[in-house]
């Protein structure tokens, strides 16, 4: 299987190519600046990796991209490039949630040998909010427990605990005991995004004799919202971003499950509908700030007058 994957949902651009060979797959990857900068460098990076892999667009089995959530500019760039290349080459497109790619990135980096676990993927959404999703894995099968959503940092801990309840009264979610996060410590694929939690419970029970379940939070939010997240002190927190290599790792199972779509159906995953304040909202905010500034100025003036009167009284 020959695959191209890229993710531009964050400030980091990630591109990777997989070429199958008789002795196993070979990989090429590129890292660069993402966001708005990705629009000027993504295609050049893709062309360079395909040249190194000696592949043409027509040789690809699918073009995979991180569909979001994330930077609106980055998502539009990735989606438009994926659609354009797929139309021209006549190959299908595989949209992969950037949060799912983040979960796989964290697992591959911190727990490659673990057979079961759960990752809560968190990306900074700016505006004092985070994108969040919960994914569990048993063997090579990932399951979406909580679909991507938008939360305030203070909401994440309670929202994460609710994933345990989604599995039923027996609380078989990896890393949870009696519905609460289990002991952990800090460290420096998916065959259908909407599988029923019951299926995951069966898979986990089948592997209970293996290594202890691994439970972690992963993302780029810990340095930004560390105090507001209120994560358990002993929780594993992995600093990570979605990577194209992780998309390649989840892609074969997704393709086998029929997740590829024609180019016109490959769309970004927008979790937030609003990215800017309206003119009216900005005016109200400006007026409120002006009102606060006026009150503060009046208060300061009153203090000065009071101090002056006191000084005059003391002098007499």
Identify what each model region corresponds to.
Residues 33-41, 72, 76, 80, ...:
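Residues at secondary-structure transition points
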